[in-house]
Every structure is written in structure tokens, then in C-alpha cells.
């Protein structure tokens, strides 16, 4: 009868199991013999007789028997064949000297034995020469990865000074699991590991065979960031021709003009407040508390559209003189003449292309090193570095789903709230929706119709209509206005919800732009009252004031008679609150949170280029809207004087940060080059290589919004943001209008993610852009010190803290070096560069 197939399989399984168990037993027993012999040698370092000679003799006989049967011990074990009288390692009597049993080492003539394992090139113990520090290495308590750096092994040399010759087998090496300590007399200076070279302390563990797992991941964390060397580009400065020298002198003149115009604080913020411990600043528990300060002796009056400040009523000397309109427009025309010169355009284009290629070469040589440097910074990645939304309008700060949920909740919870006065009748919220033939059930995102679509491209008027939910201006007035029948309570509540979302994210900040129209002087007090009464304060938020350029509309409506009326309505209350804070207490505390002033409207509208001799604001009584640069000058001049006055009284200052270069003429960018700290958009710089190069040299901030531009003026793939970034312009990403543009709860992260996906930005690129956004923002010196490092105001790697920014010193040093080289090129080797970044 033939055996059953299952019986054959069972027999084969039993035989294989028996062989496996036997092999394991022999392997385990041989290993134990080696380990016990090592312990005995350690316990008797001076050659004393072992305590149990019978046991030693029996072990030697077993070892000889094993070697006779199997030839040689397994490759995974150190060679431990008995020493014989004839010097051989096979049979014969066990060799003794003074009663001691010796263990044979691998003959020196044989090559090293390599037994590769996963993630390792070789197994320790194959050679009698090894680095002492590699016997037992600290590893992370969360990972079995050894701390020896894979990159240290490349950098360290194989000199004899770094090597230790171990005679025979070292029991401490065999006990790699930490049961036995390292011998105290074995090169203590090499075994000891300086604590300063470790980022964290780690527990010691390992496996029995001394085979360490792959060390790469943990090594990256153990290494101090930025210890790796990188390839520095060394491109010698070109010797300019005579034509290039003249072009460089023109660029120098433009940069010096800007220095004369832009407001700079007399005492830098880091000199006023020295931050020794950049820990989390204490939250402001009473942001709207007002303490009487009294009125100063200053006196001011408006002359030709610009406020002049005097020490007292009898004084005639202007305390804070500013360039007049004629001088400004003359200098503006000089800049326009420079940017139109053909030879200068050619030179600047060539320099910009060279900047781009230098960065590409830097990435080819150092991208991997930047990546590893980022990995070495514990805790930090793109998600938990500070990012500031440097350009976002408050009326569109929420996404469409958020607004829809809020409207539905109010319609459900407060249907009988009187919300609007229309056509001589007060209407409740329910009556408003009934008049629109809508119910809460009918509402959805599509019906809300606030999202920009194809119809808004090159149609700024249609884009503005998207601020009306369901196409109804009455819903905009109820939910998105602060000066309405309910004193903006609904807008205040949804604003608080947005603040709460920002605070929950912790690492996202915003600078919200809120409108002052200039129709009446009481607008400032109304806005400040709305902010204070609704307790709209967050450590993650500051405010900018935006002025819509709508003079022609107000003139047609009969609200104003001249442009001077708008300037009076905007700036007179600010000077009053500065000279006498008690006269406008709510405005005074609100201005502590205002960091910038913006100009907004459709830049694509045609306008006349201003001449050197323009009418004064009081003389501007025609129905046409003044040119963009006309608005810019008078806002700049009044803000300059206001900031000088506020600085003299120890108050916060307000920078000019308008929309510019989104569309329209290149003149807009020339005017903002002379007067502004940073701008929003700036995509038209792609049309002027000279202005683009000047913006690079001056490091003027550009808060760019590619998704917003994609809906209005420029397709996403044509946006110049990636080119600007490669060339080294000071760019940041912003959202502009989340209500119309974005779809997620975190619009700023959405902006970053789309840019990273489309333009293949690396993690280092994203963190550099986020760092730029903090520099451009108007947050306090204390907060910036906490967010990006206490020395953030210093140039180059000295001002970078990778543990806070996650930007490698390699990238920062490259940017700083290239910028300094360009400045020396433009100034013909005579540039005077400050060690501090101009705020």
C-alpha cells in the first residue's frame, strides 16, 4: 500500500523541524560557550587560574568536537577555535600556557570577514581593528536606530589616531546589549561622548550579536543642524564697461531716492526692547484698556493736502518736514526715465537671469544638504512654522461654507431680529428672506454665489459683486458690514469664529484689511467702537486700514466737493487721537493694533500720468479720479508726518503697504518703489526688468496671491511668483479673498499647497516663503523674536534660527551672499551694507 501524501508531508515537516531545532541548539550552545569564555577572561585579566578547571576542560573538548564535525564555526560568530600545540586550529590537544586556555584569533593574513545585514555594510567583529566608539552607541528611546551618523562616517578620516587596536576578543564588544559596561581603562578619551554633541539623551540598547540597525534616520536627529559643509558659489565680480558703469550709477540714484523717502524709525524696535529670552510673550489680557494720558502741546494744520505739525500754537517751524508734491513727482519721472532706458533694461535683464541661474546651480549642488539640515531640526516642519497671511480682506476672511453655516444658524436662532431698514420699513431677518423667496432649507453654496468663476476674469466689477450673498446687497449689508442697523453684530460674531480658527491652528496669523472710505470724519470712531464693543482682539491678528480709491463716485453723489475733503476725513481724526488720546479713547486703543495703510481698487482703469506740477487736493474739484501715484503721495506724506509724531510720543507707527502692480500702468510700481515698505501683488514687475531688479536690491516685500490673480487678471501658470522666488525677491504667499477664492477651512495652507504642487516647491522653499511673510508683517518685535528667533533682524545666517524657521543656514547664507554681491556690483564695489535688516 502506497503511503498517503499527507503522511509524506508530515514526515518531511517533522524532519525539517528536527534539523532546524538541532541547528538552532548547536548555534545557541556554541554562542554561550564563547560568551562564557569572554566573561572568564574579563574576570581574570591578570592570568589567574579559572575557578573551575573541570568546566573549562569540558568546554574545550566540546569545542574541539564541534569543529571536527562541522569544520569551522558559523560566519556570524567570532573565530574561537582552540589553540593547539602545533599552532593549528583543527584537532589535537588543547594548548595551555601556565594553566590558561587561549582562544585563537583570525590569522592576520586572511581578509576581513564581511557579513552584510539589512541597512549595514558589515558586521562588527570581523576585524581586530575597530573604532572604540562604535562598540555601543546610544540610540533613540523611540527607535532602535543607532546614533552613529552615516554622514559622520564619510567625514571622519581613517587615521591611526582615530583607531583602537583591540587585542583578542573584547567581552564588552560581545555584550552589545549593555549587560556589561565598557572597560574603564580602554581609551577613555575616545569612548567618552561630549554631551554638547547630542541634541537629546538616549537609552542604550542593541542586539546580542552586536549588529546595529540602520542609523540614518536617528543620526539626522542627533546631529547638530548646519554642521554639514556645502558648496558655495564663487562667481567673481564682473568688470563693468563704461556703459554699464553709467547704468549702475542710475540704479544707485534710484536706490538713494528711495532711502530719502521711505519712513524709518529713529530707534529700531530691537533697540527699544531687548529680548533676552524669546519665550512666548505674555498675552495682552486688557487690549482695549485706556489710561488717560493728557494732551500734548503739539499743534497741527492741513496745508496743500499735507498735515504740518508744530511744537505749540505760537511755533512756526515745521517739526517734521516732508518732500513736497512737486519734488516727489519730479523724482517719480526720473525713475520712470531710468526704467525706460534700453541699455539699463538690457543690463537688469541679464542680472536677473544670472540670479535665477545661480539659484538653480545652488539647488543642484546643495538641495540634498538643505533637506538633511531641515531633518536635523527637531519638531519643526512646514506645518508648525509661523506663516502670516500678509494680504487678506476682512469682509472676505471666511470661506463660503463658513458664511453659509453662519447665515443658516442666525436664520434658525434669531429669525425675529430686526436687521435692516429698507424702503421706509424695518425688516426682521425672517422677513428679509421671505422677501427674497428663500428659506434656510433652500440655501446652499451654489445659491450663495459668492465664489469667483470664469465670468470674473478681467471683470473687476463682477468680482466685487461676489461680495453680495445670493446677489443681494441687503444680505451683504446685514452680514458683511459693520456700520448697519445692528452695529455690525453679525460680522463681529463671524469674525470671532475666524479668530478662533486661527488660534486653534496656532501657527497661522493674519493681517486683515478693513475699509475707511473717507466720506465723513466719524468713520474712524465708528470703526474703533465696533472693534472695541465686539472685543475683536487676537494674538494672531493685526489690522490694516484700506482706502478705496472712489473719489469720482463720491463726487458724483455729492458727498465730497474736492479731494481735500477725503484727506481731511481720513487723517485729521488720526492726528487728533495722537495729540490728545483722551479725545478719541477707543480710536487710540484701536490704533495700537493697526500696522499698515492700504490703497485698493481696480488698477486696470485708464488714468492720466501725473505731471511735475499737479493741482493741490483743494483744487482737485473735477469729476475724474486722481491717478494712482497722486493717491500714493498724499497718503505717504500724511502718514510720514503722523508716524514721526507718534514715534516722538512713544506710540506705534503705521506703514504704507498698498495694492500695486496687480494691473494697470507701470507707474504704480515706480511710485510705490519710492514710498512703500511692501506691496500687495506686484505681478506687473514681470513687464519691467529694471523695476524688478530695483525691488530685488531694495528687498521690498511682495505679498502675492496667485489664486486671486488667476480669477481676475493672470492665469496661474503665467504667474511670475516662481521666477521672482528663484531670483531672490522678497515674496510671500497670501490669500486675498478666501470667500471668493478658496474652498477649505485653512485658505493660507491651501494657497501654499497649490503653489507647492504646481511649481514643485520643496519644503525648504515653503519655509523660506513663510519666513519672508513674518518679516513683511507688522507684528511686534517681541512676537517676531519668538516666532523666528531673537536675532531675526541680523543679516544672513546670524539672523536665522533653524529650530524656529526650519530654513537651513545654507539657504539663508546663499541668499545673503548673492544679494551682497549684487549690491557691490551696482555700487561698483563701494556699497555700505548694514549688519541689520531694514525693518
From Swiss-Prot:
Homodimer. Interacts with AHK4. Interacts with EER5. CDD domains: AMPD (cd01319). Residues 40-167 are annotated as: Disordered. AMP deaminase plays a critical role in energy metabolism. Essential for the transition from zygote to embryo. Its cofactor is Zn(2+). This is AMP deaminase. Substrate binds at residues 393, 462-467, 662, 737-740. Keywords: Allosteric enzyme, ATP-binding, Endoplasmic reticulum, Hydrolase, Membrane, Metal-binding, Microsome, Nucleotide metabolism, Nucleotide-binding, Phosphoprotein, Transmembrane, Transmembrane helix, Zinc. The gene is AMPD. The modification Phosphoserine is found at residues 134, 140, 203. ATP binds at residues 289-296. It comes from Arabidopsis thaliana (Mouse-ear cress).
Amino acid at each position: 500500500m502506497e503511503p498517503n501524501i499527507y503522511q509524506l508531508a508530515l514526515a518531511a515537516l517533522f524532519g525539517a523541524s528536527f534539523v532546524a531545532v538541532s541547528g538552532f541548539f548547536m548555534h545557541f550552545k556554541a554562542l554561550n560557550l564563547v560568551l562564557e569564555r569572554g566573561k572568564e577572561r574579563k574576570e581574570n585579566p591578570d592570568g589567574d587560574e579559572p575557578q573551575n578547571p573541570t568546566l573549562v576542560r569540558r568546554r574545550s573538548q566540546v569545542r574541539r568536537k564541534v569543529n571536527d564535525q562541522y569544520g569551522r564555526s558559523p560566519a556570524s560568530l567570532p573565530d574561537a577555535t582552540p589553540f593547539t600545540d602545533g599552532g593549528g586550529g583543527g584537532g589535537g590537544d588543547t594548548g595551555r600556557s601556565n594553566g590558561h586556555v587561549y582562544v585563537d584569533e583570525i590569522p592576520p593574513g586572511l581578509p576581513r570577514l564581511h557579513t552584510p545585514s539589512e541597512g549595514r555594510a558589515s558586521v562588527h567583529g570581523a576585524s581586530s581593528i575597530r573604532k572604540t566608539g562604535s562598540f555601543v552607541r546610544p540610540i533613540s528611546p523611540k527607535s532602535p536606530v543607532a546614533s552613529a551618523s552615516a554622514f559622520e562616517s564619510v567625514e571622519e578620516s581613517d587615521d591611526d589616531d582615530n583607531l583602537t587596536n583591540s587585542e583578542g576578543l573584547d567581552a564588552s564588544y560581545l555584550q552589545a546589549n549593555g549587560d556589561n559596561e565598557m572597560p574603564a581603562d580602554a581609551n577613555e578619551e575616545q569612548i567618552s561622548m561630549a554631551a554638547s554633541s547630542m541634541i537629546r539623551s538616549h537609552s542604550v540598547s542593541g542586539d546580542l550579536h552586536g549588529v546595529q540597525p540602520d542609523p540614518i534616520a536617528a543620526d539626522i536627529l542627533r546631529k547638530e543642524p548646519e554642521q554639514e559643509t556645502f558648496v558655495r558659489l564663487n562667481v567673481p565680480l564682473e568688470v563693468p564697461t563704461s556703459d554699464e558703469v553709467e547704468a549702475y550709477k542710475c540704479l544707485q540714484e534710484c536706490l538713494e531716492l528711495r532711502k530719502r523717502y521711505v519712513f524709518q524709525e529713529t530707534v529700531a524696535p530691537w533697540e527699544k526692547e531687548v529680548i533676552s529670552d524669546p519665550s512666548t510673550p505674555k498675552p495682552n489680557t486688557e487690549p482695549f484698556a485706556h489710561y488717560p494720558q493728557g494732551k500734548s502741546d503739539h499743534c497741527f494744520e492741513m496745508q496743500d493736502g499735507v498735515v504740518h505739525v508744530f511744537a505749540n500754537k505760537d511755533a512756526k517751524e515745521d517739526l517734521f518736514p516732508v518732500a513736497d508734491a512737486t519734488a516727489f513727482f519730479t523724482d517719480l519721472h526720473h525713475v520712470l526715465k531710468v526704467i525706460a532706458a534700453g541699455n539699463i533694461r538690457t543690463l537688469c535683464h541679464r542680472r536677473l537671469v544670472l540670479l535665477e541661474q545661480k539659484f538653480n546651480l545652488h539647488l543642484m549642488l546643495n538641495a540634498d544638504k538643505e533637506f538633511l539640515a531641515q531633518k536635523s531640526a527637531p519638531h519643526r516642519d512646514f506645518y508648525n512654522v509661523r506663516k502670516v497671511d500678509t494680504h487678506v480682506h476682512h469682509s472676505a476672511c471666511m470661506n463660503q461654507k463658513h458664511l453659509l453655516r453662519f447665515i443658516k444658524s442666525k436664520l434658525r436662532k434669531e429669525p425675529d431680529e430686526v436687521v435692516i431698514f429698507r424702503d421706509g420699513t424695518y425688516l426682521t431677518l425672517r422677513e428679509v428672506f421671505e422677501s427674497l423667496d428663500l428659506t434656510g432649507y433652500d440655501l446652499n453654496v451654489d445659491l450663495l454665489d459668492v465664489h469667483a468663476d470664469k465670468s470674473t476674469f478681467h471683470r473687476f466689477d463682477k468680482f466685487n459683486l461676489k461680495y453680495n450673498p445670493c446677489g443681494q446687497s441687503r444680505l451683504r449689508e446685514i452680514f458683511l458690514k459693520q456700520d448697519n442697523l445692528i452695529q455690525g453684530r453679525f460680522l463681529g460674531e463671524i469674525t470671532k469664529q475666524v479668530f478662533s480658527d486661527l488660534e486653534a491652528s496656532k501657527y497661522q496669523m493674519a493681517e486683515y484689511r478693513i475699509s475707511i472710505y473717507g466720506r465723513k470724519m466719524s468713520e474712524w470712531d465708528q470703526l474703533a467702537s465696533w472693534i472695541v464693543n465686539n472685543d475683536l482682539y487676537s494674538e494672531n491678528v493685526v489690522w490694516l486700514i484700506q482706502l478705496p480709491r472712489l473719489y469720482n463716485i463720491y463726487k458724483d453723489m455729492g458727498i465730497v466737493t474736492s479731494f481735500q475733503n477725503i484727506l481731511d476725513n481720513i487723517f485729521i481724526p488720526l492726528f487728533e487721537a495722537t495729540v490728545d488720546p483722551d479725545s478719541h479713547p477707543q480710536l487710540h486703543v484701536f490704533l495700537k493694533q493697526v500696522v499698515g495703510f492700504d490703497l485698493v481698487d481696480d488698477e486696470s482703469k485708464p488714468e492720466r500720468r501725473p505731471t511735475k506740477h499737479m493741482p493741490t487736493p483743494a483744487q482737485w474739484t473735477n469729476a475724474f479720479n486722481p491717478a494712482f501715484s497722486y493717491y500714493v503721495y498724499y497718503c505717504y506724506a500724511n502718514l510720514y508726518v503722523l508716524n514721526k509724531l507718534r514715534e516722538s510720543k512713544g506710540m506705534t507707527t503705521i506703514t504704507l503697504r498698498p495694492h500695486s502692480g496687480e494691473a494697470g500702468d507701470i507707474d504704480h510700481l515706480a511710485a510705490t518703489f519710492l514710498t512703500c515698505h511692501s506691496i500687495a501683488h506686484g505681478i506687473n514687475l514681470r513687464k519691467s526688468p529694471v523695476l524688478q531688479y530695483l525691488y530685488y536690491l531694495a528687498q521690498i516685500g511682495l505679498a502675492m496671491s496667485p489664486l486671486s490673480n488667476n480669477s481676475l487678471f493672470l492665469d496661474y501658470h503665467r504667474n511670475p511668483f516662481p521666477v521672482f522666488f528663484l531670483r531672490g525677491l522678497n515674496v510671500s504667499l497670501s490669500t486675498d479673498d478666501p470667500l471668493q477664492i478658496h474652498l477649505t477651512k485653512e485658505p493660507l495652507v491651501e494657497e501654499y499647497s497649490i503653489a507647492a504642487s504646481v511649481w514643485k516647491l520643496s519644503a525648504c522653499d515653503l519655509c523660506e516663503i513663510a519666513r519672508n511673510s513674518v518679516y513683511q508683517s507688522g507684528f511686534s518685535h517681541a512676537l517676531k523674536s519668538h516666532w523666528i528667533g531673537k536675532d531675526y533682524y541680523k543679516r544672513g545666517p546670524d539672523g536665522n534660527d533653524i529650530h524656529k524657521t526650519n530654513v537651513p543656514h545654507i539657504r539663508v547664507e546663499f541668499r545673503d551672499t548673492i544679494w551682497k554681491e549684487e549690491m557691490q556690483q551696482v555700487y561698483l564695489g563701494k556699497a555700505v551694507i548694514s549688519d541689520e535688516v531694514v525693518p
